[in-house]
Regions:
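Extracytoplasmic gate region of multi-pass secondary transporters
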Residues: 33-34, 237-285, 379-383
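Central cavity-lining transmembrane alpha-helices of secondary-active solute carriers
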Residues: 59-77, 97-98, 280-293
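Cytoplasmic membrane-interface "Motif A"-like loop-to-helix N-cap segments
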Residues: 81-93, 299-310
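C-terminal ends and interior cores of transmembrane alpha-helices
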Residues: 93-111, 311-327
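Glycine-rich segments within core transmembrane alpha-helices of 12-TM secondary carriers
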Residues: 151-174, 371-383
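Helix-loop-helix hairpin linking two adjacent transmembrane segments in secondary transporters
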Residues: 161-206
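Multi-pass alpha-helical transporter architecture, strongest
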Residues: 202-209, 354, 406-432
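C-terminal transmembrane helical hairpin of 12-TM major facilitator-type secondary transporters
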Residues: 303-350
């Protein structure tokens, strides 16, 4: 037997490794979103029309989501053929380098149209790399976990993204407090350049994460497929489509962290620092709430918890954006933390267990990667669509709330059509005839 099987970390260590890796990886991803909302319209897209510049800047945030489906095919294939751990290293290096290079870019004023083109290229590179992060981390966590705690351990993957968001927000709070001239000339570069440290720390941590036991066993039995994607689409197309639509709940997250920040600061004149603190506190609450929702999903099932995580934000997005429109910062904190810190965390606690459990080991990472990344690609353009729907001054918030609610309800319906899997053993996942036995 392969010696690596004897060196597999305990489920707890595997989950912590995935948590830390995801946190470090998504630090890179979220700082771009924050900069796209607050800085890039002024230094990369100075059109003379603030609304047009904001839409263009937020569109570059969405461009990475277009690259994600391409990356999902490549990295999903690699994860199901060479292993989850190898893909985790590839994604970390790709994200870290692309983000660091963004921090070195000259501005539009310095090199003209070449500046936003280079920004776009690096943003695409980010999207390609991140496409395999959550699917590989969650697959590894699921496959290491005890049968009755799979949702709990898998939930640490998305809890890690909250950690990355917290880190990114806390870095941007002092940077955002700089005088406008300092922020636009050099201050915005600091979070991007710090990604070099993030990348090296992440690589040091992930070297301790061993390959999934079931993948190692499948490899030893020579059952690893050379081409998992044809098998995926031949046997699991309905499951891939269900995951795709269920992933649309991510629209709530992107509207919360990107559109709400833009609308609150640029349109309603709320304090940039206050809004960043609201995002940070919501993510701190989510950091603790997500594993608790995962524990509940192990007791009552994935689907009931998922419904709470989709239906709740579909309702709460209305008072949240309304509070921003009223410039009531206290209510913004209350509804922001309730929506994204507590209720949306139910989705995060159940999602990757439910999605991974629709597929067997040989196509699991491909299925989750392709399904989620196509869904996230649609959701990634939510901030720019919201900016267009809201009008030139971004003041018409009702269509934005409708967009978020509609996407969350579609996700809820998709999740309800999936097979409930919390009592299905690992070897029976993705095999309906065995799951019913």
């Amino acid at each position: 037997m392969d010696d690596s099987l004897h060196r597999v970390k305990t489920p707890r260590k595997a989950a912590i490794s995935s948590w830390i890796g995801s946190a470090l990886e998504y630090y890179d991803f979220f700082i771009y979103g924050t900069a796209a909302a607050l800085v890039f319209p002024k230094i990369f897209f100075p059109t003379g029309n603030p609304a047009a510049a904001t839409i263009a800047s937020l569109a570059t945030f969405g461009v990475a989501y277009v690259a994600r489906p391409v990356g999902s095919f490549i990295l999903g294939h690699l994860g199901d053929t060479i292993g989850r751990r190898n893909v985790l290293v590839i994604t970390l290096i790709g994200m870290g380098l692309a983000t660091f290079l963004i921090g070195l870019l000259p501005t539009y004023e310095q090199i003209g149209i070449t500046a936003p083109i280079l920004l776009l290229v690096l943003r695409v590179a980010q999207g390609l790399a991140v496409a395999g992060e959550q699917s590989s981390a969650s697959s590894a966590s699921l496959e290491h976990a005890p049968e009755d705690r799979r949702a709990y351990y898998t939930s640490f993957t998305l809890a890690g993204t909250q950690g990355g968001n917290i880190l990114a927000t806390l870095v941007f709070i002092p940077v955002g407090a700089l005088p406008e001239d300092a922020l636009l000339s050099w201050g915005w570069r600091i979070p991007f350049l710090l990604s070099a440290i993030v990348m090296f720390v992440g690589l040091w941590i992930r070297r301790a994460l061993q390959e999934s036991p079931v993948f190692v066993e499948e490899k030893e039995r020579q059952e690893v497929r050379r081409a998992p994607l044809p098998v995926l689409f031949r046997s699991y197309t309905p499951e891939v489509l269900k995951v795709l639509f269920a992933a649309l709940v991510s629209v709530i997250s992107t509207l919360f962290s990107i559109y709400a920040l833009t609308y609150g600061v640029n349109t309603m004149g709320l304090s940039r620092t206050s809004m960043l603190w609201m995002v940070a506190l919501a993510n701190v609450v989510a950091l603790g709430a997500i594993p608790l929702w995962g524990m509940l999903a192990d007791r009552i099932g994935r689907k009931p918890v998922y419904v709470v995580g989709a239906l709740g934000p579909a309702i709460l997005i209305w008072p949240f954006i309304w509070a921003i429109s009223q410039q009531n910062i206290a209510l913004v904190f209350v509804f922001g933390i309730l929506q994204s810190g507590i209720v949306y965390s139910a989705y995060s606690g159940a999602a990757f267990a439910l999605w991974n459990e629709q597929f067997d080991t040989g196509v699991r990472m491909s299925g989750v990667a392709v399904g989620t990344q196509f869904g996230f690609a649609l959701g990634g353009f939510a901030p720019s669509i919201a900016a267009a729907l809201a009008g030139p001054e971004l003041e018409n918030w009702v269509p934005v709330a409708m967009l978020g609610s509609g996407a969350a309800l579609v996700a809820m319906i998709a999740a309800l059509t999936m097979r409930e899997t919390y009592r299905v053993p690992l070897e029976g996942l993705g095999k309906p005839e065995r799951a019913r036995a």
